[in-house]
Amino acid sequence: MPQTAHSPQHSASAPALALTIAGSEATGGAGAQADLKTFQELGVFGIVALTCIVSFDPEDDWNHRFFPVPTEILQQQLDAIQGDYPERLRTVKLGMQGSPEVIRTSAAALRRAEWDHVVLDPVLICKGQEPGHALDTDQALKAELLPLATFTTPNHFETEQLSGMTVRSVEDLTAAARRIHEISGAAVLAKGGMHLPGPDAVDVFVDGDTVEVLSAPKIGQSGVSGAGCSLAAAVTAELAKGATTLEAARRAKEFVRAGIAQAVEGRTPFAALWQGGLR
């Protein structure tokens, strides 16, 4: 994929642009909805191509209902977007893809354009789903999207899947993040979240030159819907505005922590992150 040393040209009257290729989550807590709210909150003009529609089923213990967008419809969305902003759109986030066919469609579209930043949130399953749901997308994501990424934000499960390592400590998380960077060449923000022992939520940033542990006290004892989506979207927005990868990681961590502290409660098993937490 072509890469250039493009310098973002934007202001309050001409904001930076960012595209998310992701799924819709009906309650507004995660997915493309979270991405667009994050972009808007951080002063970036958000654009979306939908890959799937996901909804919780209140009659079935809030399990996920998953409806893939046909690949030809995804392609039509991407054609419209890339035709409308051929010069200015240089930053993209990849979220929930949902199937190998969709992954291949997204990857082909990315290869047809030049990008400064490709942020991969390597979503293999929706929050609350069993790991087995990841099996059919795992290999396609590694083969098609990871090589295109300039930055990736795997959670604990995804870090283990992408690195092939078991992660039980901060040291393990650091080693796994290094491994993912070696495989992909991308900057990595590996998220320990609630899964590592201790009082702090620990993430590890690795870009080949820098290794930095980003740590802050845990808030609550359970995960929050939209935290991973919003973290990757915040990284994307900051990169679109011209931040370095490390600056983007630090600011995204702060953004998500503030949103978790003011999470929106509903009847689903997970509260939803509030993107306005830093106001």
Regions found by a protein language model. Give the residues of each.
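Conserved N-terminal subdomain of the carbohydrate kinase-like
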Residues: P2-T20, A32, L36-Q129
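Short pre-catalytic strand/loop immediately N-terminal to key active-site residues, enriched for Gly-Thr
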Residues: I21-T27, E212-S225
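Charged C-terminal helix
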Residues: P68, L246-R279
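Conserved phosphate/ATP/ADP-binding segment of small-molecule kinases
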Residues: L135-V211
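Short, small-residue alpha-helix embedded
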Residues: E160-Q161, Q221-T245
